[in-house]
Amino acid sequence: MKLAKNLLVSTLALGLLTGCGSTGNTTTSSDIVTEITEPVEITFWHAMNGAQEESLTKLTDAFMAENANITVTLQNQSSYPDLQQKLTATQASPANLPTLTQAYPDWMLNAVNDGLVLALDEYITNETIGFDDYEDIVEGFRTATVINDKTYAIPFNKSTELLWYNKTLLDGLGLEAPTTLDELATVAQTVQQETGIVGAGFDALSNYYTTYITNEGEVYDADFDVTGQASQDAVNYYLDGVKEGYFRIAGTDKYLSGPFASETVAMFIGSNAGESFVVSGVDGKFEIGVAPFPAKNKIQQGTDLYVFDSATAEQKTAAFEYLKFMTSAESQLTWATDTGYVPVRTSVLESEAYKTNGSLVTPILEEATQGLFTNPVVEGANATYKESATMMEGILADPTIDVASHLEAFKNTLASIW
């Protein structure tokens, strides 16, 4: 069964992944090398560590075994902040950029507008080397790779948010996992009243805020009124719960998987990629339940793979072949099983091999990846996204705060960024 399409979210994503200035270079079909006949080396900057890097290396070795003329040199940049910083610094000297990189879309906006990133549309549709099954890539992931109406990346390591809950506790109270935000508040309130345990919380306040307003039909961009009704509702929904004791924030714990494991919070919204931390923390003390995010629209997170236009024609084709391999169904099954990331292919999400791999989250991810959205990739988007967390934390840390004046100050902050 195909994943359900969310027309509104997809349309917004495609229309809003835009920037100012020029667009990236356009490759025509006649420019594309369709066969690698001589040895070629490509470099790949990434920030994968631990089990992620082990799986990446394993898959890369398998690719090179199948493609004798292509050498892929993996260059670990240590962390996402370090990778972003190096990419930004190196854009001033395009000849020093790698062949391809792992990156978030908002990192690449200026590079795309400066013509430094290869548009992949002609490669994807090429009769000789193109994707035979590009539509199999989850739509919500594909839309995030489009900037200025062109495809500049292939989805790679993806995640979304899920509801983690203490199933033993909820079952004992005769409660079911909530499927809407209203139900989440009701169940959380019941848990708190019956047991004294905090009902729920959200790991990422920026995700909470932007997801809430998206489900209200709004888009978090320069035209959104952060003092308006949707913004007020987002703030007050969480604030009411904090005031009454049935919601909490992660705060100094950073992630709610710790309080969840220690049974001081009954439910929390967090990434599917955090499963190993949840399972190891709980360590069998109670049965863990997991369910899709309790709203129609869910945020998609994670990086995509971009190819730089400074590469030679042969390197571009070699890089594209590598992208195809890394996002093939077989590779995605391996990658998702090894790392806990969401496979980017619908066929893998639907497969029994994936659903029965022993993970708690795999049986529900087909449903959990319906209605995915991405925040608009526009100038200032990353900074304003982070500011939303600062705003939320400031309000939730002081339940006596004047919300209206705080949102007015938030509006002024955003006006200086957009």
Predicted regions located by residue number:
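Hinge/lid segment of periplasmic solute-binding proteins
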Residues: P105-T160, Q193, T214, E287-A291, ...
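Extracytoplasmic/periplasmic substrate-recognition and gating elements
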Residues: E66, T88, S280-Y341
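Short, polar/charged alpha-helical segment
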Residues: N49-T71, S388
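Extracytoplasmic "Venus flytrap"/periplasmic binding protein-like
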Residues: A62, E66-D136, L173, A266-M267, ...
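Short, well-ordered beta-strand elements
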Residues: T37-N49, I70-Q75, T99-L100, A200, ...
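Short, low-complexity disordered leader/linker segments with a strong preference
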Residues: M1-T43, A65, E408, N412-W418
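Glycine-centered hinge/linker elements that transmit conformational signals in sensory
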Residues: V187-T190, E194, D223-A250
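Long, aromatic- and glycine/proline-rich binding clefts that accommodate carbohydrate-like moieties
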Residues: T337-T390, G394-I395
